[in-house]
Amino acid sequence: MFYREAGQFYTSYAKDQGIFQLKQDKYGLWGILFIAFVVVPVGLYLMVQGGLMAASTKDYLYNSIFLLLLVNSMAALGLNILTGYCGQISLGTAAFMGVGAFTAFKFSTGLNYRIQKEDEAGELVSELIPLLPAIDNPILLVLIAGAVTAVVGVIFGLPSLRIKGFYLAVATLAAQFFLVWCFSRVEWLYDYVSSSTIQIPPLKLFGLVVTGSETVMRDGQQVTIYPAAETKYLICLSLVVFFAFVAKNLVRGRIGRAWMAIRDMDIAAQLIGIRPLATKLLAFAVSSFFCGMAGAMSLIFYLGALEGAEAFNINESFSVLFMVIIGGLGSITGSFLGAGFITLIPIFLVVSLPWLGGQFGIPVDAAMVEHIQFMIFGALIIVFLIMEPLGLAHLWQIGKEKLRQWPFPY
């Protein structure tokens, strides 16, 4: 069989402790990355050029499915570090994503603040004054958003030093409601706009338009250049792949072992020299860093503009939690599997339920689809918690072990 360790052996402890125990796993990952970075963009481009797909369909796949999947994967990675590896329950993931989004917006506009002064007629007028030069690099904005969110996460992670379990979940839920209230009430966060709407200004990376538009002169005529969906997709994909690799190495090292010791039994971990204070706060910081980047990516690449804080409500926090539970707690792979499952199931239901209802003469509207979606998610959570607590990642691991042993039953 092709999936065997026969002929593969290691001559050093470093290689024996590598991420991939089988070469097939490494080749499989490289194959997935090749498909994501090369096959998908080139394939969709050729399909559009060949008339097999409309350009609007291609843009829909990028803007409504692929980008959302990448943003959810980044958020699930962050929550899995905190809940899956360190055992600290959080219901404030969406709020931390909101912190990242608003941070990216403020730094992209130079941290504007409003002053009032008298004009020539003696009337008071408002003027926005930037504190810093505006940042127009989207990757730098994402990193800054993650860093600021990490600080906020540490502040709201302080209760974990005294409480845990259900009580910690309630504390993070309070953080969720408080931060969402700030997003709607603190005028400075949305540049004092009456509609509470924020919109990322035009950004460029390596000369490519990422957000907004750019007008240039070509052959004596003005041409408006809009951001290509492929550009946003490849930037997001690069960020997710890089930080997934960082997370994988982080949880396999000394820090990750300390997190898992706190998760399994915090008293025993303290007895062997692990400091609960630093370990838990570091988990909150790293988790919030990932969630903040997810929020910034959502605003910059996926949404573009945001009205109030509706995109970061409590439902989004539960959705990310469902991704982690269904995908597998304490698994980097499970974060991607759960994000893919939770992201694609609603799209499948939106397409299939109206068609299925039409076959039986039952009208199915958007509200009914949403209710059925919640019912399915709730049922899946119960099923996975009872029958497969380790999630889809464990099923994937079992499948690989069965493949290695085939055709023998042991």
Descriptions of predicted regions:
Residues 1-410:
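Transmembrane alpha-helices and adjacent helix-loop boundaries
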